[in-house]
């Protein structure tokens, strides 16, 4: 059955740094990774070539499906964003702990000592509560019920309160402590 020879090659080979799965998903993307079909016309006439394969390729070019490499780019962005947010949370937590140490050590005679101390402790407690709620939110995400929505609302309010408290804390903290330790 030597009626003709069909060669199918990929523009990007698996050795080009991508995984084999993302390379073979080319027809779904419509992003330049379409299969090149070369037909030796000496062996096959145009009416003998299966039109199903060419019509599938043309339809896949028109579709807007995302490649797995496109999805991994979005997942990578989300992961990097989450890491950056986590690092910012840790920085805020350590800054508040350092401010608490500063208040206790050097600023215990300041006129705003009690207000600053209350706000630092309140901010630290709220940060811990928000962190614990984030853990539970992840577990509740599977169910998407009313408690998930309530937890999400409480988290937004908690983050807002932490922000307001830290702005007020920056305004009320003074360095006019009379104690020299």
From Swiss-Prot:
Residues 1-115, 175-181 are extracellular. Residues 94-110 are annotated as: Helix alpha2. Residues 1-72 are annotated as: Disordered. GO terms for cellular component: membrane. Keywords: Cell adhesion, Cytolysis, Membrane, Transmembrane, Transmembrane helix. Residues 12-26 have a biased composition (Polar residues). Residues 1-10, 33-49 have a biased composition (Basic and acidic residues). It is a multi-pass membrane protein. It comes from the Eukaryota. The keyword Cell membrane does not apply. Residues 137-153 are cytoplasmic. The keyword Ubl conjugation does not apply. GO terms for biological process: cell adhesion; cytolysis; killing of cells of another organism; tissue regeneration. Residues 80-91 are annotated as: Helix alpha1. The chain crosses the membrane at residues 116-136, 154-174. Pfam families: Ninjurin. It is found in: Membrane. Its main location: membrane. Belongs to the ninjurin family. Composed of 4 alpha helices: 2 hydrophobic transmembrane regions (alpha3 and alpha4) and 2 alpha helices (alpha1 and alpha2). Alpha1 and alpha2 feature one hydrophobic side and a hydrophilic side. In normal conditions, NijB is inactivated and alpha1 and alpha2 helices are not inserted into the membrane. Following NijB activation, alpha1 and alpha2 helices insert into the membrane and drive NijB oligomerization via interactions between alpha3 and alpha4 and the hydrophobic face of alpha1 from an adjacent subunit. Effector of non-apoptotic necrotic cell death that mediates plasma membrane rupture (cytolysis): oligomerizes in response to death stimuli and promotes plasma membrane rupture by introducing hydrophilic faces of 2 alpha helices into the hydrophobic membrane, leading to release intracellular molecules that propagate the inflammatory response. Also acts as a homophilic transmembrane adhesion molecule that promotes cell adhesion by mediating homophilic interactions via its extracellular region. This is Ninjurin-B. It comes from Drosophila melanogaster (Fruit fly). The lineage of its organism: Eukaryota, Metazoa, Ecdysozoa, Arthropoda, Hexapoda. The gene is NijB.
């Amino acid at each position: 059955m030597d009626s003709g020879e069909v060669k199918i090659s990929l523009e990007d080979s698996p050795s080009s740094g991508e995984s084999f799965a993302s390379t073979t998903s080319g027809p779904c993307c419509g992003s330049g990774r379409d299969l090149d079909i070369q037909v030796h016309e000496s062996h096959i006439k145009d009416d003998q070539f299966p039109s199903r394969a060419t019509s599938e390729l043309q339809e896949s070019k028109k579709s807007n499906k995302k490649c797995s490499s496109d999805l991994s780019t979005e997942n990578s962005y989300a992961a990097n964003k989450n890491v950056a947010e986590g690092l910012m949370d840790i920085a805020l937590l350590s800054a508040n702990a350092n401010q608490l140490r500063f208040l206790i050590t050097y600023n215990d005679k300041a006129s705003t000592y009690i207000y600053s101390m209350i706000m630092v402790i309140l901010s630290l407690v709220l940060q811990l509560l928000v962190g614990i709620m984030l853990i539970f939110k992840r577990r509740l995400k599977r169910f998407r019920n009313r408690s998930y929505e309530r937890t999400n609302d409480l988290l937004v309010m908690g983050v807002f309160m932490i922000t307001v408290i830290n702005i007020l804390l920056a305004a009320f903290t003074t360095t006019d402590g009379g104690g020299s330790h």
